[in-house]
Amino acid sequence: LPQYNGDFRSMPAYLDAGDWDAAGIKWVNVHPDNREQFDLPTVIGTMIYSDPRNAFPLAILDGTELTMQRTGAAAAVATDHLAVEDATSLGIIGAGVQSYTQLRAISTIRPIEEVVVSDLDEEKVARFVDTFEGEFDVRPGTPEDAAACDVLSTVTPVESPIVEREWLGEHTHVNAMGADAKGKHELADDVLLDAKLVIDDYEQTTHSGEINVPYGEGVLDDEDIYGEIGQIVVGEKEGRTAEDGVTVFDSTGLAIQDVAAAHVVYEHADENDNGYPFDLMGLDG
């Protein structure tokens, strides 16, 4: 929807985790101008979580919060496998809602002490600092300041790179979380070419992930992609090794992540009698 500077995504998935399985679909948008024009979130999502045995809709969930949490979790998983073990500093470029779950999730798997946050919107930066200053040594900074940290998460919708290769530390791990549509591009091409480059899904990242622009232009090809994060998680490929320098995780977000997150939320709600039961299909009467 270029006329509205936004887009919709329909994200269905079935997940078989062995001891449980589930299905679901998320209807979600990205409209960067929402906050300014309508006082609405940039991302608004709705998740329908279903029983795959009979297609019965078990729950309707807030897909916006679900997206925030699973995106932070995805970055944390990648950081766990690709960042240095003693990473104590985290840089974040983009101080919107995703920045909060980046810090919350990543700090659970690395001993983060120092946080540098960068955004063109000084009010967003101030809110972020106010939220976390009692837990971390957190301060505002430039994109260059943030990029010098042990771990960097970029969560912006830009189409012109904002992170240069020379800004990164020798062993910085970068979570490129912002690119989720064709044309978006946060990292300079030489960052991607110099790094151990890990993606979440080949079809999605080559079309709309961080690598979509250089891949489409032929600057980067399949030989430059180390592998998918799933291959590392299950042990098919190694994560960080002693020889690795900069590492990059290109995340577009997967529908199976939404189903997995919805499963956790649904099971917790069911066990603790949370939520609001209602007869959506008129079966109780």
Task: Identify the meaning behind each predicted range.
Residues 90-91, 247:
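Conserved beta-strand elements of the Class I
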Residues 99-100:
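N-terminal Rossmann-fold NAD(P) dinucleotide-binding loop
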